[in-house]
């Protein structure tokens, strides 16, 4: 059986880790790394075997994402976005559009992204303000999306729009280069994950063939949980990102403690309080990774409470990551505050954890509703 984590970890150590500081410093999308990710075949893992892919599932999706995030959170997040958009397309898309997208991924090394957040509604991505004018063979769209990961680099963008009055919930797949589609890269100046290029996306009189409409038929697609499969993959991916990031914070803080010398040949690691902090970091990383593995295993087995486990794992990884980042800075001290070493970069990356959709507060609310038998939506 293929070890997806090891495969991705070896790639990450060779092709991502050496460039993590540069990605953060320049704040640019790591195109060369993503070209290598595509060439190595990582974007193909969710493609069904009948299309020539590996037919992998949520566990493998999380394992690869975590390994990439251990190199830099930017790589993990941008990778997971592509997988989520692909999973949605494979689940709900018509054969024509599935074949087109799969061919581009398999033969042309393309990848995808999500475009759902908006300026007015923020993380409430199901409440789109997009304007869609439907015609017989095409539709005209006007509107904007606020923070689009991999903007200007992904080849397809999955956008949310208001439900169709006749056919119900729908997303659209927007090919890069569509007339009327623009990105504002100058508006991206992220505190952390600076290589995401999560800039605004504008659509002005954008004309799309109606084949790019992906209608959400939950019954036909056999959706077993209260939200669609793409949301579940997204939460698993974010859990993996912050699990990987938390693991790297632990390793970086431990390395600093072992290498920081005092007179008398002692190190920070010889101080009892610092040992307690390092132990705390290990605990955070271990708990997050254990929760991720348990939740994705439950989802792979379609266990009844798998959705609650995925959400709880996401909350755990997010809060543990932020806690570890703060503790890592305490261990790093003045050197970390002066941006010597990776700990200050890792802290900035971690601060995205509690606020990304679905936010920690939203997730806790959802878990509470489900375990008390209330309607989620």
Which residue stretches match the model-derived regions?
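Residue-level recognition of alpha-helical structural elements
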Residues: 1, 26, 30, 97-98, ...
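Glycine-rich phosphate/cofactor-binding loops in nucleotide/flavin-utilizing enzymes
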Residues: 334-377
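Buried hydrophobic positions in well-ordered alpha/beta secondary-structure cores of metabolic enzymes
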Residues: 12, 64, 141-143, 203, ...
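Glycine-rich beta->alpha junctions and the first turn(s) of the following alpha-helix
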Residues: 190-285
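A short core secondary-structure module
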Residues: 144-183
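C-terminal helix-coil-helix/basic helical segment that borders enzyme active sites and/or dimer interfaces
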Residues: 20-24, 286-316, 329-337
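Amphipathic alpha-helices that form helix-helix packing interfaces
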Residues: 239, 246, 253, 281, ...
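Glycine-rich flavin
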Residues: 29-39, 43-145, 149
């Amino acid at each position: 059986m293929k070890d997806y984590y090891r495969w991705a970890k070896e790639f990450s150590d060779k092709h991502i880790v050496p460039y993590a500081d540069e990605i953060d410093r320049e704040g640019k999308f790591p195109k060369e790394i993503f070209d290598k990710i595509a060439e190595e075949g990582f974007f193909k893992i969710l493609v069904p075997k009948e299309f020539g892919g590996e037919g992998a599932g949520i566990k493998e999706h999380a394992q690869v994402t975590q390994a990439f995030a251990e190199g830099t959170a930017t790589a993990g997040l941008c990778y997971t976005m592509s997988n989520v958009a692909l999973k949605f397309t494979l689940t709900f898309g018509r054969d024509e559009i599935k074949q087109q997208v799969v061919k581009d991924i398999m033969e042309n090394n393309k990848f995808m992204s999500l475009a759902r957040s908006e300026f007015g509604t923020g993380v409430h991505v199901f409440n789109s303000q997009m304007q869609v004018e439907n015609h017989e063979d095409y539709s005209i769209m006007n509107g904007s999306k606020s923070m689009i990961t991999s903007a200007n680099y992904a080849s397809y963008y999955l956008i949310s729009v208001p439900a169709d009055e006749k056919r119900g919930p729908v997303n659209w797949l927007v090919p890069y280069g569509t007339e009327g589609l623009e990105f504002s890269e100058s508006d991206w100046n992220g505190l952390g994950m600076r290589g995401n290029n999560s800039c605004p996306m504008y659509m002005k009189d954008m004309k799309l063939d109606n084949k790019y409409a992906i209608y959400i038929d939950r019954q036909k697609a056999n959706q077993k949980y209260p939200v669609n499969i793409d949301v579940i993959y997204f939460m698993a991916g974010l859990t993996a990102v912050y699990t990987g990031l938390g693991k790297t914070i632990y390793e970086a803080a431990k390395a600093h403690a072992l290498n920081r010398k005092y007179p008398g040949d002692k190190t920070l690691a010889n101080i009892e309080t610092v040992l307690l902090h390092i132990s705390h970091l290990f605990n955070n990383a271990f708990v997050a990774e254990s929760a991720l593995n348990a939740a994705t295993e439950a989802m792979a087995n379609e266990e009844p409470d798998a959705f609650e486990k995925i959400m709880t794992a996401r909350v755990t990884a997010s809060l543990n990551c932020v806690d570890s980042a703060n503790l890592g800075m305490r261990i790093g001290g003045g050197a970390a505050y002066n941006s010597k070493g990776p700990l200050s970069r890792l802290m900035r990356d971690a601060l995205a954890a509690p606020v990304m959709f679905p936010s920690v507060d939203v997730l806790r609310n959802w878990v509470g509703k489900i375990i008390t038998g209330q309607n989620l939506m």
